[in-house]
């Protein structure tokens, strides 16, 4: 948190001229009601850059997605991977992996809002984990992917480890659970 602001992304752009850069996760309410000039600051040199959104209300996520697309972001990414206590308390982040129907509803609303914006081709993507806590049922992961893909998500950014919602800090969640090797070739084409 508090790292990938516009200054950090400008530096990353120098290091990686073609990489897709991501913002910090910003809650949909903050996009709608907050100080956009501060929260969504972006220099043209940063492109391509994806806005990472947090939330679980399809209507709020739709409004935030439309605003973000029209502000020039190259991708809108729904974060379903953050394990922090604060994020869980707000019912967004990794805990949403337990609610694939809600995530699908959110993605459908986001895609519809972006599709009717001034920039209808901006993709809506999802960041997720392989599972939550000790749920390591790969079929459950595939069910999540299928459900959300059917709602229109064509790209998933998979953090290849489970998110532990109790007992580990977000930093530990990036280090402690073992990484799982998967190959991604397209919708529902995942293998161990």
List the predicted regions and their residue ranges.
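Flavin-dependent oxidoreductase catalytic cores
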Residues: 1-192
């Amino acid at each position: 948190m508090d790292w990938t602001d516009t200054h950090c992304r400008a530096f990353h752009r120098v290091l990686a001229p073609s990489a897709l850069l991501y913002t910090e996760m910003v809650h949909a309410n903050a996009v709608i009601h907050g100080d956009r000039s501060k929260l969504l600051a972006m220099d043209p040199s940063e492109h391509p850059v994806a806005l990472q959104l947090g939330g679980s209300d399809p209507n709020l996520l739709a409004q935030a997605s439309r605003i973000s697309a029209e502000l020039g972001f190259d991708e809108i990414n729904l974060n379903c991977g953050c394990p922090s206590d604060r994020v869980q308390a707000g019912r967004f982040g990794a805990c949403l992996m337990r609610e694939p129907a809600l995530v699908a509803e959110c993605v459908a609303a986001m895609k519809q809002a972006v599709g009717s914006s001034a920039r209808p081709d901006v993709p809506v993507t999802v960041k997720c984990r392989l599972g939550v806590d000790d749920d390591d049922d790969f079929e459950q992961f595939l069910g999540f992917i299928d459900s959300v893909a059917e709602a229109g998500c064509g790209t998933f950014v998979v953090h290849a480890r489970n998110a532990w919602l109790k007992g580990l800090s977000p930093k530990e969640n990036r280090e402690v659970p073992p990484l799982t090797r998967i190959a991604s070739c397209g919708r529902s084409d995942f293998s161990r």
